[in-house]
Amino acid sequence: MLWHLVFILIAILLLTFSPKIESLFKSFTINKPTKTTCYQYTTREQLKSILESDTHETNFCIEKPSISPPKTNSTLLMLCRNSDVFSVLETIQNIQDRFNDKYNYDYTFLNDVPFNYEFIYLVSSIIPHGKINFGLIPIEHWSYPSHINISLATEIRQNYANVPYGDSESYRHMCRFYSGFFYKHELVKQYQYYWRIEPGIKIYCDIDYDVFEYMIINDKKYGFVISLFEYSETIPTLWNHVVQYINDNEIKSELLPLLTNKYNWYNLCHFWSNFEIANLDIFNNDDYENFFQYLDNLGGFYYERWGDAPIHSIAIALFLQKKDIHWFENIGYYHVPYLQCPQDIDLYVKNKCTCNPDEDFTWSDLSCTNHFLNILHN
């Protein structure tokens, strides 16, 4: 009887004080990061403590207080591997020196596997302030969709060995991800604009204005630096399917001439998407989603080698207007093997550029920029 009374008393105490007890235990527990967890730190010792407390298998951010917050809701976006860490560090330092030390924008890093301790620690250490997002790509966004015959796709890849990344499985996953899923990632969709960067790229000029603020003030939705022709072998059926989609949906666009030649057929031109500064709304809408689903169901990402650059470019030509597009001509941008270097000597000196203007790709026979500008400005 006595024990019965004791149990009743304990039950009453637990019901009465359970919120306080739960709070007490929480104060002694290191929680695994949730989808929105953001760790704040001010010293490297605190950063190490944060990293050593968890395996970080999901999406989270690390934040060091910034004196001057960014003016717009934008992020620098990079898809990379743990093994890329040293080229990532070089690129970040370059971007900080040339641009972001002045504007303090967030970085968002995405990977198809969890970022490891070394990557997170080194990257967080080199960025002096602001928020750094580390995200894991959902497996369904980095794998074969159910309608793809994997054996057939594997066999077909061998026929593409003579074109860049032609026999790569991961490259195809990447192109599909950047075509239809990156803007849906929970760490990306919180922003309005993104600037896509890649490991190893270089910025050769000081950027003395806020590129995101410029895009917003001037109502620009898509910005590019370099354009070029796609390898026709990688997209043999893409344009036929696009024409079918245009006809089926009765699409009229003033930008279609960007992608057609004098014979009114596909000219293979595209914006080089390893650099793009864009409004995420150009992808987060029914028009783009329907277009992507149409292409994805055709299987061309795996049965051919459709790239995200032609997909983005075709969508821009279908759904945007001339006034929405901006060419960043004075960035001084390099991604192997092409360079965009300012030709105006006064701007070159003013922005402390260090690239060789004679190696500029913009006006070469392999560039589409002259054609693009003629369409955009007429």
Swiss-Prot record:
Domain of life, per lineage: Eukaryota
Record-linked Pfam families: Glyco_transf_15
Transmembrane regions: 5-25
Bilayer topology term: Single-pass type II membrane protein
Location in or out of the cell: Membrane
Record keywords: Glycoprotein, Glycosyltransferase, Membrane, Signal-anchor, Transferase, Transmembrane, Transmembrane helix
Enzyme class, UniProt record, top EC level: transferase
Residues glycosylated per entry: 73, 149
Lumenal-side positions: 26-378
Cited InterPro entries: Glyco_trans_15 (IPR002685), Nucleotide-diphossugar_trans (IPR029044)
Protein's UniProt keywords contain Transferase: yes
Name the UniProt record assigns to this protein: Probable mannosyltransferase MNT3
Organism (species): Candida albicans (strain SC5314 / ATCC MYA-2876) (Yeast)
Protein's gene: MNT3
